[in-house]
Regions:
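Alpha-helical segment of the N-proximal tetratricopeptide repeat
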Residues: 1-33
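Short solvent-exposed coil/turn linkers within tandem alpha-helical repeat scaffolds
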Residues: 30-36, 67-73, 102-112
Length: 120
């Protein structure tokens, strides 16, 4: 399983997001309970985010939160959801997401970054 994950992450790190999406999806289908699964889900979502496919990124980041509630990347997932909502013009959703981030993870770096977001 580690090999599949590392190949997908290598594609992600090199900006080959479409290949990375396929790799992370394969990893998650084959090894859903692996210790790397929460990271794979986050990076899968981030592939869509980095391609500015925000409507696809949001539900993938939400899966990080819903399926891996203790994942270390949850604050960053919420931050990226807020940015994706902003990019889609959904300011109310962005504001709500930042509020959730503040409540759940008040001392995280993602929360600090979210304070700098300008939400109209």
């Amino acid at each position: 399983p580690t090999e599949v994950y590392l190949q997908a992450f290598g594609d992600y790190a090199s900006g080959r997001y479409q290949s990375a999406v396929l790799g992370f999806e394969t990893f998650l289908q084959r090894f859903p309970n692996n210790s790397y699964a929460s990271n794979a889900q986050f990076w899968l979502a981030d592939c869509y985010f980095n391609q500015q496919q925000y409507a696809l990124a949001i539900p993938q980041f939400e899966r990080v939160l819903n399926e891996y509630s203790a994942a270390a990347k949850n604050p960053e997932a919420l931050y990226k959801i807020a940015i994706a909502h902003l990019q889609l013009g959904a300011t109310d959703e962005a504001r709500q997401t930042v509020d959730i981030l503040n409540q759940r993870y008040p001392k995280s770096k993602a929360t600090q970054k979210a304070q700098e977001l300008v939400i109209p």
